[in-house]
Regions:
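Short, small/polar-rich loop/turn modules that mediate ligand/substrate recognition or access, typified
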Residues: 157-161, 213-215
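Substrate-binding pocket helix/loop in short-chain dehydrogenase/reductase
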Residues: 82-83, 90-95, 184
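Conserved NAD(P)H cofactor-binding loop of Rossmann-fold oxidoreductase domains
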Residues: 74-79, 222
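Canonical Rossmann dinucleotide-binding motif of NAD(H)/NADP(H)-dependent dehydrogenases/reductases
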Residues: 1-17
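Conserved glycine-rich Rossmann-like NAD(P)H-binding loop of the short-chain dehydrogenase/reductase
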Residues: 14-28
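Catalytic loop of short-chain dehydrogenase/reductase
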Residues: 119-157, 169-170, 223
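C-terminal substrate-recognition "lid" of short-chain dehydrogenase/reductases
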Residues: 196-219, 224-225
C-alpha cells in the first residue's frame, strides 16, 4: 500500500522520503520506477519499534528535504492475539510500531513543516469502528492511532491538518489463503475487495481539500456496517 501511495504522490520536482525495514530490494525497485517520472526519491532504513532509529530517520529526512509538507503513517504490525493469550512482547511491539512511532514522527514533522498545505495522514483500520475481541494488541494500537489523529488535529491546527483512512479488506495478509480472503470481502455489504487505488485517491482527496481535518474515512466496502453478527443471527431478530 505504501508503494501505491508513493506512486500516487509522485511527479516532476516532487521529493519523497520512503521508509523501509526489511524490504530493501522492493524499495530500491520502487525508487528506480519513480525516478522515471522525475520524482526525487530518498530511501531510509529504520525499525519503527526503536526510538533511536526513528530519530535517525527524521534526521536523515531533514538533511534531504528543504522542509516537510506531508507525512503518511502507513507502516504497521499486524499479528493475532486475544486478551487470554497476549504476551508483553506482542503488546509492546504493536504499541511501538502502530502508535508510538506515528506519534514521534508526527512530533518531528510538526517541528519541520514549512509548506503552505501541511498534512499528516494516518492509515488506521475499519476495526476501530467495529470492535471485536480478536487481534487484541493490534486493535488497541489502532484505536490509539484513531485517537492520535483526532487529538493531533486539534493540537496542530491551523498550520497542519491531520486525517486518517480506515481500510477494510484491501490486501491479503501473509496468513490468509485466497479462499479465506475472498470470503472476508464477500461478507461486506458491497461484496467487493477494496482497491488500493481507492486508498490512494483518498490520500489525494485529503491533501487537496483544505477544509478537512480530524476526520477518519472508512474505505472498506461497508465492512464496519455489518450488522449480521452471531448474536443477531442466533436471536429472534434473525429471519430467513
Amino acid at each position: 500500500m505504501g508503494a501505491a501511495i508513493a506512486k500516487k504522490l509522485s511527479g516532476p520536482n516532487i521529493e519523497i522520503v520512503i521508509h523501509y525495514n526489511k524490504s530493501k530490494s522492493k524499495a530500491e525497485s520502487l525508487k528506480k520506477d519513480l525516478n522515471k517520472s522525475g520524482t526525487k526519491i530518498y530511501l531510509v532504513k529504520a525499525d519503527l519499534t526503536k526510538e533511536n532509529e526513528i530519530e535517525k530517520m527524521l534526521k536523515f529526512s531533514k538533511s534531504k528535504l528543504k522542509y516537510f509538507d506531508c507525512l503518511i503513517n502507513n507502516a504497521s504490525l499486524f499479528e493475532n492475539d486475544k486478551l487470554e493469550n497476549f504476551t508483553t512482547k506482542s503488546w509492546e511491539s504493536h504499541l511501538k510500531a502502530n502508535l508510538k512511532a506515528p506519534a514521534l514522527l508526527s512530533k518531528g514533522f510538526a517541528k519541520n513543516a514549512r509548506g503552505k498545505n501541511n498534512n499528516i495522514i494516518n492509515i488506521i483500520d475499519q476495526r476501530v469502528f467495529k470492535l471485536t475481541p480478536y487481534f487484541f494488541s493490534y486493535t488497541l494500537s489502532k484505536t490509539g492511532l484513531y485517537t492520535l489523529t483526532k487529538t493531533s488535529a486539534m493540537s496542530l491546527a491551523p498550520n497542519i491538518r491531520v486525517n486518517g483512512i480506515a481500510p477494510g479488506p484491501t490486501i491479503k495478509n501473509k496468513r490468509q489463503s485466497d479462499k479465506h480472503f475472498k470470503k472476508q470481502y464477500m461478507a461486506t455489504p458491497l461484496k467487493k475487495q477494496t482497491d488500493v487505488q481507492e486508498i490512494c485517491n483518498a490520500v489525494d482527496f485529503f491533501i487537496k481539500n483544505r477544509s478537512i481535518t480530524g476526520q477518519v474515512l472508512a474505505i472498506d466496502s461497508g465492512q464496519n456496517l455489518n450488522w449480521q453478527t452471531p448474536d443477531i443471527m442466533g436471536g429472534k431478530e434473525w429471519k430467513n
